[in-house]
Structure formats: structure tokens, C-alpha cells
Design a protein with these regions (language model features):
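A short, glycine/Asx- and small/polar-enriched loop/turn
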Residues: 29-32, 77-80
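Long, contiguous binding/interaction regions
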Residues: 1-26, 40-47, 54, 59-73, ...
């Protein structure tokens, strides 16, 4: 849960909106949680990368990969946690919320 909290801290620092955490344990063999969030402005997307790097250094976790720099969808792979940070339009287009609508949500704020 520490990794999830760090990811949420980074998103909140970037003023992300409509943050949802989908529990994909036992459903997806590659990661346990997927975070979906919306950026109010495109410049927030790239700010997330810097903020996640700061959180990673501070909390001692590794960023496996980060893709989508300069696009409208940033995907950050934190091993067991994936962050999907979209513009509003891209989030509607790809609609991960619909794809994972049958999966449980982790409530915010995250408790230890």
C-alpha cells in the first residue's frame, strides 16, 4: 500500500482529478493495481513524471518504465502499480474505467 500511497501523492501534487484505483489482483498477471486519473491541462501530464521520480527517490521504489511523454496519455509502470494519467478526452476515448468496471475499487484515502 505504500507504493499506492506514493503514486496517489504524486497525482494529487499534480492536481489530478477523478482518481480511481482498480484492484486487479488475480485478474491481471502483470500488475496488481491500475490507477486512472485525469489531467486538467496537458502540462500536468509531464509534471507527473517528475513528481513520480521524486516520490520514487524519497520512498525507495523503482520506476520500471514511463511512456507517453508529450502525448495525452502518460503510462507509468511501478511494477505492481500502473498509473494511467490522461487528458479528459483521452480518458473518455480509451475508457479504461468501463473495461475495469467489474473490478473492485480501492477507496481513497488509502489506509495502511
Amino acid at each position: 500500500m505504500k507504493l499506492l500511497k506514493s503514486a496517489i501523492n504524486a497525482l494529487e501534487h499534480c492536481n489530478a482529478k477523478d482518481i480511481k484505483i482498480y484492484d486487479l489482483r488475480g485478474y491481471n498477471p502483470f500488475f496488481d493495481y491500475s490507477i486512472v486519473a485525469t489531467a486538467v491541462a496537458e502540462r500536468q501530464l509531464n509534471a507527473l513524471i517528475s513528481q513520480i521520480q521524486e516520490e520514487a527517490e524519497k520512498e525507495g521504489f523503482e520506476i520500471r518504465n514511463c511512456v507517453g511523454r508529450g502525448s495525452k496519455w502518460i503510462l507509468v509502470d511501478l511494477h505492481d502499480v500502473m498509473i494511467n494519467f490522461f487528458t479528459y478526452e483521452e480518458r473518455l476515448h480509451f475508457d479504461l474505467d468501463k473495461i475495469w468496471s467489474n473490478r473492485p475499487l480501492v477507496e481513497l484515502p488509502i489506509k495502511e
